[in-house]
Regions:
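Alpha-helix termini
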Residues: 22, 32, 77-83, 105, 121-126
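Phosphate/oxyanion-binding active-site loops and adjacent basic polyanion-contact surfaces
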Residues: 62-70, 107-111
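RNase H-like nuclease fold core
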Residues: 1-64, 76, 157, 161
């Protein structure tokens, strides 16, 4: 059994609410040299019409971007893990962990729809019981030691399209 560490981030790119979100993710082998080895990565910009058409979101928000980042990561990186492997999603938005584990109640219908799509993807891939979520404190200066800080900063730049 292997463990795959996936770092995801979402960003509300347009603070004037013109409907632009960025999502980014990286899958790493943390036992590789240095901070680990990149196995795959993605960076996507999403428009308001995508969010509305797929999730019924009438507005773009940072929480929705964070969750869509998780959904994209599960779809993008599924080719890496097998039926017995463990997957850990690392995100700097606490809502990812709390909503996905049921500790927070979802109030917005579009957030519930995104979570439902993530749940469907987990079922489709058979990841139940093998997927966990870790919260990473965001926006920290890299200390040269902690891989969580390193990779979180990396996916933050992917989500903002500055890789």
């Amino acid at each position: 059994m292997k463990q795959f560490d996936v770092y995801t981030d979402g960003s509300h790119l347009d603070k004037q609410n013109n409907g632009r979100l960025g999502v980014g993710g990286v899958i790493v082998n943390l036992s590789g040299p240095g901070m680990g080895t990149i196995l795959g990565k993605f960076s996507n910009e999403l428009k308001q019409d995508y969010m509305y058409d797929n999730f019924g979101a009438s507005k773009c928000s940072n929480p929705s971007a964070e969750l869509v980042g998780v959904l994209f990561a599960l779809r993008e990186f599924s080719k890496f893990w097998g039926p017995l492997d463990k997957v850990v999603i690392h995100a700097d938005y606490l809502g990812v962990k709390e909503w996905m584990t049921g500790k927070w109640r979802i109030k917005e219908p579009y957030i519930a729809k995104i979570k439902s799509e993530i749940d469907k993807e987990i079922m489709k891939q058979g990841l139940q019981g093998r997927l966990s979520y870790e919260w990473v404190k965001g926006h920290q200066k890299f200390d040269g030691v902690n891989p969580d800080i390193y990779w979180n900063n990396y996916v933050d730049s992917l989500a903002k399209g500055i890789d």
